[in-house]
């Protein structure tokens, strides 16, 4: 294989890598901003592949003597549209009246059509250069699939967590532009263009490359602007991990944590949430010495648990080390959780909660389950019958489990699905709720795998700002406008809770 053919085959590797990268960026961005990762990735992939098919069909109309020139144009267009896609979508989503979904799928379609034209053009160029057809197909497809493999590994493990979606988009746009420049230079004698036209193409390539380089350099600023517009407050911490996007904002004395764009707490009223989550269970298991926290990487549930001097050990299991590190070291956040992670009674385990429960042998008097809302299947499995059965093996016969369970007012089917799932897993349950102004009416469920009775506490042995005998009594009483609907338990094979959650919140949130 001569040098020109080898370089064209190498271009296939880069083209395939970039094409899959834009698909992954669009899917990840849609999941981050719109939720429901299964639906978003499925629809993005379907639209992208359909558009690639259109592009492959359209490529037949490119004249043989214009293949190289059109390939250069394609690479510049793919680099431009693909490179700016993440930044443009981030900024667009922050505009309330913007047609985000329309623009998202329009971009996916345009990029898909352009990418779909690339490989057929390369194959035709190689065929015209006397490459044997059987060798041509095998080499092109081999490097096509190798490029896809490389990006499918690098994107979730390195690129997205270290560079972020916006900078990753610009990086791959630069790769497409580099292929265009290299093709323009190496095959300049075969382009069949005048020096003036070649100069115009080089000028266009330079402009696209300069724009993408500027975007790459300004990626953090662009992300900050878009998230500032989205959240409305000053951003004091913004971290991308392999698992999620963490953003902490501040307005006056109000600190707020967002995970993948969803509010997790406001420092103005989080004490209501965390007192309601933790204190009824710990007051009801008077001799609780060992406590398990699943999730809760902000340390705010820990703060409430550590008020009890009889608690000897707390194990906190949170998937994301970036989360627990942030709330262990950032000054304002450490002050909020009152240095909970520095308490010698606390052990932090950064692991998947389900996998940790399968291997651990520890037993606990109280288990606090404070996972994010079940907005996708990866979180929904942590609200399933098998998970709760696994958890019950680690709770003492007289112990209690408490679970944050979304809103019984805004998401009634989701809330009562958690209750039904716990019952299906063999627990007795005592549902309750509390008003948290930043969330609205929020729900929790106390559950016991062994004990048969529970009475809401009438006094608290630790200082409280929200709970007393009256508020506790009210928490365990449901008004007529929060009835229990008919729901099915959440099992791994149906993930009904994720469906309920999406349907309940549709129309409540954007």
Swiss-Prot record:
It is an enzyme of class 2 (transferase). Residues 205-449 form the PABS domain. The active site is at residue 370. It holds the Pfam family Spermine_synth. SUPFAM superfamilies: S-adenosyl-L-methionine-dependent methyltransferases (SSF53335). The chain crosses the membrane at residues 6-26, 38-58, 74-94, 102-122, 140-160, 165-185. Keywords: Cell membrane, Membrane, Plasmid, Polyamine biosynthesis, Spermidine biosynthesis, Transferase, Transmembrane, Transmembrane helix. Its EC number is 2.5.1.16. S-methyl-5'-thioadenosine binds at residues 244, 318, 352-353. Disulfide bonds: none annotated. CDD domains: AdoMet_MTases (cd02440). Its main location: membrane. Residues 207-456 are annotated as: Spermidine synthase. GO terms for molecular function: spermidine synthase activity; thermospermine synthase activity. GO terms for cellular component: plasma membrane. The keyword Iron does not apply. Spermidine binds at residues 274, 298. It is a multi-pass membrane protein. Pathway: Amine and polyamine biosynthesis; spermidine biosynthesis; spermidine from putrescine: step 1/1. It is found in: Cell membrane. GO terms for biological process: spermidine biosynthetic process. Catalyzes the irreversible transfer of a propylamine group from the amino donor S-adenosylmethioninamine (decarboxy-AdoMet) to putrescine (1,4-diaminobutane) to yield spermidine. NCBIfam families: PRK03612.1. Belongs to the spermidine/spermine synthase family. This is Polyamine aminopropyltransferase 2. It comes from Ralstonia nicotianae (strain ATCC BAA-1114 / GMI1000). The lineage of its organism: Bacteria, Pseudomonadati, Pseudomonadota, Betaproteobacteria, Burkholderiales.
């Amino acid at each position: 294989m001569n040098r020109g053919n080898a370089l064209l085959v190498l271009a296939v590797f880069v083209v395939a890598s970039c094409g899959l990268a834009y698909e992954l960026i669009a899917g990840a961005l849609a999941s981050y901003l719109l939720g429901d990762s299964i639906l978003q990735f499925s629809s993005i992939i379907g639209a992208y592949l359909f558009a690639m098919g259109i592009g492959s069909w359209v490529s037949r109309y490119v004249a043989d003597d214009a293949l190289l020139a059109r390939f250069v144009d394609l690479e510049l267009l793919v680099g431009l549209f693909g490179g700016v896609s993440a930044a443009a979508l981030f900024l667009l989503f922050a505009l309330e009246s913007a047609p985000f979904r329309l623009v998202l799928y329009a971009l996916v379609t345009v990029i898909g059509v352009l990418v779909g034209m690339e490989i057929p053009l390369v194959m035709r160029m190689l065929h015209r250069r006397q490459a044997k057809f059987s060798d041509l197909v095998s080499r092109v497809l081999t490097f096509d699939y190798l490029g896809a493999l490389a990006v499918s590994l690098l994107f979730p493990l390195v690129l997205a967590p270290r560079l972020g979606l916006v900078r990753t988009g610009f990086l791959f746009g630069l790769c497409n532009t580099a292929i265009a420049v290299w093709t323009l230079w190496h095959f300049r004698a075969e382009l069949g263009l005048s020096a003036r036209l070649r100069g115009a193409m080089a000028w266009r390539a330079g402009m696209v490359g300069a724009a993408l380089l500027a975007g790459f350099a300004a990626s953090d600023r662009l992300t900050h602007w878009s998230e500032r517009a989205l959240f409305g407050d000053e951003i004091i911490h913004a971290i991308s991990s392999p698992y999620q996007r963490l953003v902490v904002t501040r307005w006056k004395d109000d600190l707020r944590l967002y995970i993948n764009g969803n509010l997790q707490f406001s420092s103005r009223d989080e004490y209501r949430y965390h007192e309601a989550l933790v204190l009824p269970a710990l007051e009801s298991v008077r001799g609780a010495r060992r406590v398990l926290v699943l999730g809760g990487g902000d340390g705010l549930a820990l703060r409430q648990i550590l008020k009890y001097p009889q608690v000897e050990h707390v194990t906190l299991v949170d998937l994301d080390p970036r989360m627990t590190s942030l709330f262990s070291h950032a000054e304002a956040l450490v002050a909020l959780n009152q240095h909970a992670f520095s308490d010698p009674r606390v052990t932090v385990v950064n692991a998947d909660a389900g996998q940790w429960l399968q291997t651990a042998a520890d037993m606990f008097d109280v288990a606090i389950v404070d996972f994010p809302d079940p907005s996708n299947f990866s979180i929904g499995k942590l609200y399933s019958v098998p998970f709760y059965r696994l958890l019950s093996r680690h709770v003492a016969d007289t112990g209690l489990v408490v679970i944050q369970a979304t809103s019984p007012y805004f998401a009634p089917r989701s809330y009562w699905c958690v209750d039904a799932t716990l019952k299906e897993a063999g627990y007795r349950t005592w549902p309750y709720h509390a008003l948290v102004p930043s969330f609205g009416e929020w729900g929790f469920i106390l559950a016991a795998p062994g004990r048969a009775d529970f009475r809401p506490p009438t006094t608290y042995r630790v200082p409280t700002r929200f709970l007393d005998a009256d508020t506790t009594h009210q928490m365990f009483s449901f008004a007529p406008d929060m009835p229990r609907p008919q729901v099915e338990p959440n099992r791994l094979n149906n993930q009904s809770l994720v469906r309920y959650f999406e349907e309940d919140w549709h129309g409540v949130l954007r």
